[in-house]
Regions:
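Extracytoplasmic cell-surface/polysaccharide-interacting catalytic and binding patches
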Residues: 27-117, 127-130, 134-234, 244-255
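Segments that shape or occlude catalytic/ligand-binding pockets
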Residues: 120
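Short, well-ordered surface patches within globular domains
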Residues: 123
Length: 255
């Protein structure tokens, strides 16, 4: 006589269990999202909101050592207060993955290492203010002219290091950081003719650039060009994925 009642109670119990499971899963997702949000810097969150992606989510094998998150750069100061990740527009990130794959095909013992990625225009202004009245002004794009490709998420400052180098050795501090890069003749960020790729034959002839370093630069350009990047004449480490005119016409400046 109690079977209908028992069946009804079972249904109610099952519905309650399902409801509790759904609510629990929802809270789990919310908690997980909150934890991730707390672990991602404010600048990184702002970049993601502008459609940029963390290169590690596209290719975790590419090494990162942002030079402007340290003081050993040409300004001798830390410009990125909280940013430690390398962000790019998806198209640029995909191209970097292709470049890394090409390098691995040629030299499995090596890896690309990123020294600067997307750069907010506010940081660009700080850099421009430091060089605008010096002989080095042409190394930094003037924000009033729309900035450079770093400000659009379509450029990278990059080199090559040993694949065995441990990223955990890189820390955001004023102390010197040893990065196992292959020799390129100058450090990344060197403002001088030794960094100019159109001067390399002369540098080689004069013994300023060794054959090994000349070939290392050529290797970097080879893998980057294979992925669609164009080198910058005055900086062996800088590569653009599009022209300034195209970026200004089709993209938004990263703030």
């Amino acid at each position: 006589m109690n079977k209908p009642t028992d069946t009804k109670m079972k249904r109610i119990t099952i519905l309650l269990i399902v409801l509790l499971c759904v609510m629990g899963f929802s809270e789990f997702k919310k908690d997980k999202s909150e934890v991730r949000k707390a672990s991602v810097s404010t600048t990184a969150q702002r970049m993601e909101q502008q459609g940029l992606v963390n290169i590690k989510s596209v290719d975790p094998t590419i090494k990162i050592a942002l030079m402007y998150a340290r003081t050993d750069n040409f300004l001798k100061k830390m410009l990125y207060k909280d940013l430690r990740e390398a962000y790019f527009l998806p198209r640029c990130a995909t191209s970097l993955k292709k470049a890394q794959a090409e390098l691995k095909r040629l030299r499995p013992d090596l890896s690309l290492i990123i020294f600067d990625a997307t750069r907010p225009m506010s940081i660009q202004q700080t850099m421009w203010n430091a060089v605008k009245n010096t002989n080095h002004y042409f190394y930094v794009s003037n924000p009033k002219n729309g900035g450079g490709m770093h400000n659009y998420g379509m450029a990278v400052d990059i080199s090559i290091c040993k694949a065995s180098w441990n990223e955990k050795l890189w820390k955001d501090s004023a102390k010197a950081c040893s990065i196992d890069t292959i020799p390129m003749g100058t450090k990344v960020d060197h403002m001088g003719f030794e960094s100019h790729i159109d001067k390399e034959q002369q540098l080689l002839a004069k013994g300023i650039l060794t054959k090994e370093r000349f070939e290392n630069r050529a290797l970097l350009r080879r893998v980057m060009k294979e992925a669609g990047f164009t080198p910058l004449r005055t900086e062996w480490w800088h590569f653009n994925l599009c022209t300034r005119a195209w970026a200004k016409a089709n993209l938004k400046v990263v703030k």
